[in-house]
């Protein structure tokens, strides 16, 4: 738990690039789901906590759309089953985030 908290606290950087923000989101998310003791609620709380470094860096939140739920769960299951390469999960997160970034750009 201490190691996860130390890593999580290290993600708070106001000058983070988009790639660094996605990396922080992904690492926070998979790290939290691996230590969180309850089966139900892991995802909701993990998505909330994972957005904190993203928001701190000045970016809009990463939102996982309901229609992408199966892809989201598959990416997490792949990681939990031993595929410790986060590139697939980060790619999924980037795709979801791009939708949010596009909405923000349209609103301006």
Segment roles from a protein language model:
Residues 1-37:
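Helix-hairpin-helix/helix-loop-helix acidic hairpins
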Residues 3, 24-27, 48, 67, ...:
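Generic alpha-helical secondary structure signal
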């Amino acid at each position: 738990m201490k190691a996860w908290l130390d890593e999580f606290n290290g993600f708070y950087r106001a000058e983070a690039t988009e790639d660094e923000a996605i990396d922080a989101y992904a690492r926070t998310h998979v790290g939290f789901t691996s230590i969180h003791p309850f089966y139900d609620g892991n995802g909701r709380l993990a998505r909330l906590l994972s957005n904190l470094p993203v928001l701190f860096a000045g970016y809009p939140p990463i939102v996982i759309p309901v229609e992408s739920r199966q892809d989201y769960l598959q990416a997490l299951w792949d990681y939990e089953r031993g595929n410790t390469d986060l590139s697939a999960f980060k790619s999924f997160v980037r795709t979801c985030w791009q939708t949010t970034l596009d909405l923000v750009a349209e609103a301006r």
